[in-house]
Amino acid sequence: MNTLLAQEIHDKALACGYDDCGIVPLDALDFYKERMIKRLEDVPESKKVYAHSNAFLTLKENYPWAQSIVVCTEYFGAYKFPASLQKRYAKGLLLSLANIPDGVEVKQRRSFETWFNDKNIQFIGGETAKPTGVVPLRPASVAAGLGIYRKNNFFYGPKGSNYELVAYLIDKSCEYIHDTDIPPCPDSCN
């Protein structure tokens, strides 16, 4: 496990505009695979709902070179969505700043990926604002200690749930896991 490289990746992610970064071995998502398989066995009618997630169950087979997952968070604040979008799913997906081709966020992300290339780190991922990417974002973020799940199954970081999550599979073995001290949802939480 290369701790120096893990620190370099973390520091570069912050320099590229991410709020935080964690790195976990690919095995850290075994729990997700087990839970998903159990879910599909227990509720067979949910197979269509989770069909887009099937590739998450075969990461090791699909990417035999991958050893670690780099997860980055980007806090987008207490943005208030227009009234016409209230009570609709995927608002963040549709209005993500990463969808603006010449935007600052896209340029920052590209500079992070260029750095991976400069360091001869093979990678895949970086998708955000897409229905499915290479890595299951919330489980990877929680495994990296960047946040927790609360009762509503949302990802919560230190500032709440308004985060964009970005992940990469990389071909280097390294780990950078945070100790999270985010309190669980209070009993009064719905």
Predicted features, each with a name:
Residues 1-187:
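Auxiliary alpha/beta "docking" domains used to position bulky ligands
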Residues 190:
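Active-site recognition of the HExxH zinc-binding catalytic motif
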